[in-house]
Amino acid sequence: MMFLFVSLFMFIFKWQRLIFILISLEFLMLSLFLKFSYLLSEMMFFYFMCFSVISSILGMVVMVGNMKFFGSDNCIF
């Protein structure tokens, strides 16, 4: 529940920077991962785990792509 709280507030109040959006989505994925680990069957848990890894990798690709092509990542300062 704490990860859900942190991710929602970070997503609401720090939406201007890409890195904070990606971090809040990772916290949201972690909260769902912890919640669904007790509720889902083994196969659905495996699908959800694969989805969370793929979304993490795609988030990093988006951030690196923005820094490469646009020059300013607009995420640190």
UniProtKB/Swiss-Prot annotation:
> Which principal EC class is assigned to this enzyme?
translocase
GO MF annotations in UniProt: NADH dehydrogenase (ubiquinone) activity
Q: Where are the transmembrane segments?
A: 18-38, 44-64
Q: Where in the cell is it found?
A: Mitochondrion membrane
Q: Its domain of life?
A: Eukaryota
Q: What is its main location?
A: mitochondrion
Tell me the organism.
Caenorhabditis briggsae
Q: Which reaction does it catalyse?
A: a ubiquinone + NADH + 5 H(+)(in) = a ubiquinol + NAD(+) + 4 H(+)(out)
Keyword list, A-Z:
Electron transport, Membrane, Mitochondrion, NAD, Respiratory chain, Translocase, Transmembrane, Transmembrane helix, Transport, Ubiquinone
**According to its record, how does it sit in the membrane?**
Multi-pass membrane protein
State what protein this is by name: NADH-ubiquinone oxidoreductase chain 4L
Q: What is its EC number?
A: 7.1.1.2
Reported function: Core subunit of the mitochondrial membrane respiratory chain NADH dehydrogenase (Complex I) that is believed to belong to the minimal assembly required for catalysis. Complex I functions in the transfer of electrons from NADH to the respiratory chain. The immediate electron acceptor for the enzyme is believed to be ubiquinone.
Cellular-component GO terms for this entry: mitochondrial membrane
Q: Record's family?
A: Belongs to the complex I subunit 4L family.
